Structure formats: structure tokens, C-alpha cells
Amino acid sequence: MTLEADDAMSKGDDAATGGYDFTRADQGMPHHPRKQRGAGGAEAEPHPAILRGLKLFGEAASGGAAAQTLFSRHNLHVSYAWFKSGFPLPLHSHDKDCYYLIIAGSTSVGSEVLGKGDGVFIPAGAPYTVTPGEDGVEFLEMRTSPDYDTHYRGRTDSYWDRIAATLRGSKERWAEEEQPYGLIPIAP
């Protein structure tokens, strides 16, 4: 008897499904946080500068980042993301804990530089941003819930203007950049 046959017999009737959920790299879904809000709590109206900034960010961000949800259930949410070099992720926080695992490239979180195999746990409510290195960064993002808030923190027009200027000024360079590893080929 082979090891596989012995394993199948040991599993019994559950062998057919086992309760498993499989994911395929080519079957991911676009990744969008379910709730995007400005700083100030779940029921607060976003600061006017944040509303304006998110509009600018949305108009200028194409080509600098891509993300895809790989798996999402009530108690686990896993996304893959690729941020190109210098992509200016706005300062924000979430109402759920998050863990990032770097697959390739590098990024700075605060004063720490993270590379392949490194990770960072970001507790709920902690404001943060990441700054991808010269080769960009690919990472997995894991949360205990698919239902989380994003609270943006930039409250001045000049903050959002600088982000939009960086986005617009990087488009030509980003058009030539390739994923450092290409775990899941996606187009930004």
C-alpha cells in the first residue's frame, strides 16, 4: 500500500472534501478594503482634506501598485500586493490587526527596512505607511477578518498634493518596472 492510499483510508469519508478551500494564483479577486474612512472613528465623517486626497490618490495611483485577494473567509483574509519603487502609500490605520510577509524586494516601515522573508505585525489602530525600496516590494497581507476599516490620517491638502505629485512623477519609471519575483503575475 502506498503512503497516499494509507492516508486516504485514515481520513475515512472526509477524504473527498476534507473541508479544504484551495486557491489558485489565476483566480484571485481585486483587493479593496470594504470600508475606507478618514481618521476619527467608524461613524465620523472623513476630514475634507482626506476626501480630496483620496480623490487625487485614486486619479493618480494607477500603475504604481496592484493587489489581489487570494483567500477570504470570516476568520482569515489573505491578499497579495505589489508596490513599485517609492510608491507613496498614505499614512493610515486599520481596525483589525495585520501581518505583512515580504516575498521579494524591500520596504521600509518606520525606520526598519524589511526584505525577503521578513515580516511585520501591525496592531489595530496603529498608524503606518510603507515605502518600497528601489526594486519595489511584493508581500502577503494577512488579517483575521475580511471586514476591516481603513482610516486615512493625512489631514492637510499639502500632504495629499505631495502624494499625488509623487504618483504623477513616477508613472514613466513605473511603466518599465517588473515585479521583483512575480509570485502572482498581475498588472497594476
Language-model features: where?
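Short, charged beta-strand/loop "edge" motif centered at a coil->beta-strand transition
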Residues: 67, 79, 87-90
